[in-house]
């Protein structure tokens, strides 16, 4: 809880994080399920195309996607990437800054990095 060491806390949550992770076509058979619509006699076999919240592997998949994306930004924004890495837990960022201006700078930098992959964040600034 590094954010508690600063007067301004920054918490961010990737909106619909698990739905952002697309499963390769070759791997979708492992996410197969059967569906029967009302009034229909036949059972359909369908496959999920996105990572599901609640599967054991989902947090691992999301973590890999986020880490790979951060690696691609490490050369351009090394300080920001280091800050995000040490403050990120699965899809939640918990950090803090001494001033509101620095907290907003962290927020804007995070948006810039993650918008390239269409990750959307829910942000909160709190004064401790």
At which residue positions do the language-model features occur?
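Mobile genetic element proteins and their domesticated derivatives, centered on retroelements
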Residues: 13, 33, 54, 66, ...
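Conserved pre-motif C helix in the palm subdomain of viral-like polymerases
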Residues: 4-9, 15-18, 43-78
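Active-site palm subdomain of RNA-directed nucleic acid polymerases
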Residues: 59-105, 109
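Polymerase palm active-site segment centered on the conserved acidic dipeptide of motif C
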Residues: 11, 95-128
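Amphipathic alpha-helical blocks
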Residues: 1-37
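Short, well-ordered loop/turn elements at secondary-structure boundaries
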Residues: 3-6, 14, 27, 42, ...
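Short helix/loop capping segments that flank catalytic or ligand/cofactor-binding pockets
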Residues: 19-22, 31, 42, 59-61, ...
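Short amphipathic alpha-helical segments embedded in low-complexity Lys/Glu-rich regions
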Residues: 15-19, 84, 124-128
């Amino acid at each position: 809880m590094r954010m508690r060491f600063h007067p301004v806390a920054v918490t961010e949550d990737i909106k619909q994080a698990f739905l952002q992770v697309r499963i390769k076509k070759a791997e979708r058979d492992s996410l197969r399920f059967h569906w029967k619509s009302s009034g229909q006699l036949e059972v359909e076999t369908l496959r999920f195309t996105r990572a599901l919240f609640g599967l054991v592997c989902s947090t691992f998949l999301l973590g890999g996607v986020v880490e790979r994306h951060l690696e691609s930004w490490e050369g351009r924004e090394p300080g920001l990437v280091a800050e995000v890495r040490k403050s990120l837990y699965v899809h939640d960022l918990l950090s803090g800054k001494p001033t509101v201006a620095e907290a907003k700078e962290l927020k804007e930098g995070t948006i810039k990095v993650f918008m390239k992959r269409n990750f959307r964040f829910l942000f909160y600034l709190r004064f401790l």
